Amino acid sequence: MYVELKNINKRFGDCQASKDVSFEIEKGKLIGLLGPSGSGKTTILRMIAGLEKQDSGDIYINGKLVNELTPSQRGVGFVFQNYALFPYMTVYDNIAYGLRVEGKDKAYIKERVTELLELVSLSGLEKRYPDQLSGGQRQRIALARALAPKPELLLLDEPFAAIDAKVRQELRTWLRRTIDKIGITSIFVTHDQDEAIEVADEIVITNEGRVEQVGDPVDIYLHPKTSFTAKFIGKSSVITDYGKLKGFNDEGEGTEAVIRPEFVELLTNDSPKGNDPSYEDAMVEQSIFRGDSFEVILDIDGLKIKANSPLVNGPLKSGDRVKAFINMIYIIRGEETYQVKNSSLDDSNTYFI
């Protein structure tokens, strides 16, 4: 493995930021550290970079134990959330900064800066200053500067957080394509699920300093292995009285159910399938238009459940009556999570994850 974290612990006063953190990264992979604020993901990134020292545990990069190495000795490039460009330097000088610190000659620096400007599609802007660039352009320059010394590992701390939504979407695609092109092993921190799912080869879910689950985006989304992951990923509804729902039995005391919006099929009352007894009678409690669909909160026998309604169903508003069929749910028992299909679909309906 190219990067290995083994039993990492880190405490800041009374707060344990990392609790026995262990995971591995293959060479050339793009990894997303995903979790809520305060979950420890940025601390992990900073310890890999050498900007924070772990209290215990080992970090390996390219087979080398780096515990005692300084950031400059680890061969790591770091892209900060707020760009951290030098405002008094031109684009050229910002990218060249690390190369000058390394003592590279002028010819090499010019060649490398030109190469990186082409890579980030900003050739011709080398004489501009950071305040003359857009947010997206500044982030590209920050990436070029991090790549200039040819690091072995690229670390990005919420690289798109300070950028508006449209540009952020474009930069996700661009970053994925750029990292694939140069083949550098990379780790980025984010609290945005869509970003992690779209960009990462693998996702590391963090919570309260612990690693909850590691896997590719599809596996993380479809097969959550812990209670936290099941509740955190997706726009889920969490309910305890799920035995009220048609096609599901209560699995016992201490259990709860997680229902994703895509598990719910909605019909208007005039639909031919509306008389199917397996469908729930539901009332729209809240409806938000999302452009390509309506995001709704349903009241089903007192249970609040999120769902999506396609435009073909027409506009939905608070108080509308609809029919809802719930295909499946995740049952959580302690830290065990498993899928249960609606019994009207299959007699053998339990699938352990």
Task: Give the location of each predicted region.
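ABC ATPase nucleotide-binding domains
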Residues: 30, 71-77, 81, 85-225
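Helix-to-loop junction immediately C-terminal to a conserved catalytic motif
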Residues: 49
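The feature captures the beta-strand-to-loop junction immediately N-terminal to the Walker
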Residues: 34-36
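ABC ATPase nucleotide-binding domain helices that frame the ATP-binding cleft
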Residues: 42-45, 141
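Glycine/charge-rich catalytic "coupling/switch" loops of P-loop NTPases
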Residues: 237-288, 313-353
